[in-house]
Regions:
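Polybasic, low-complexity binding patches
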Residues: 60-65, 76-111
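Acidic-enriched, low-complexity/disordered segments with a strong bias for Aspartate over Glutamate
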Residues: 20-22, 45, 51, 93
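Conserved phosphate-binding loops in nucleotide/dinucleotide-binding enzymes
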Residues: 73
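Small disulfide-bonded, cysteine-rich extracellular recognition modules and tandem repeats
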Residues: 11-12, 56, 89
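Short, charged surface segments at domain edges that flank catalytic/cofactor-binding sites
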Residues: 1-37, 98-103
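Low-complexity, compositionally biased segments
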Residues: 17, 23-25, 54, 69, ...
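Histidine-centered nuclease catalytic patch
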Residues: 37-69, 78-85
Length: 111
């Protein structure tokens, strides 16, 4: 069943609103500084968006341990995909991403 962009946007907004979202502006700034670019492709000269590693549609939330900065291209491409399978399809370096994610999570969660 096909949905219009408007219907999709409204449903997504309702899912986001219903999720427990506790990422603060301070935490978002810290995440952007720690990654220093798109967490997926590494681009640094682009505007970064909040991307949930576990998508909202699959029970994810906007929290310090579930959000990474992503460029618009990666964020749109990943959409509601599971991060590791999406990275494999895009031929991105999954191992480096996961190692970096663990390193950044441990440094930020302890702060």
């Amino acid at each position: 069943m096909a949905f219009s962009k408007r219907t999709y946007a409204k449903r997504r907004a309702n899912r986001v609103k219903a999720a427990d979202n506790d990422l603060t502006e301070f935490e978002w700034i810290a995440l952007r500084e720690a990654w220093a670019g798109c967490a997926y492709c590494g681009k640094t000269d682009v505007t970064l968006q909040k991307d949930c590693i576990q998508p909202i549609a699959h029970g994810g939330r906007y929290t310090l341990t579930n959000v990474v900065p992503a460029c618009r291209s990666c964020n749109a491409s990943k959409c509601e995909s599971e991060v590791t399978s999406w990275m494999r399809r895009k031929k991105l370096d999954e191992k480096t991403f996961l190692e970096r994610l663990a390193e950044i999570r441990s440094s930020l969660v302890l702060v």
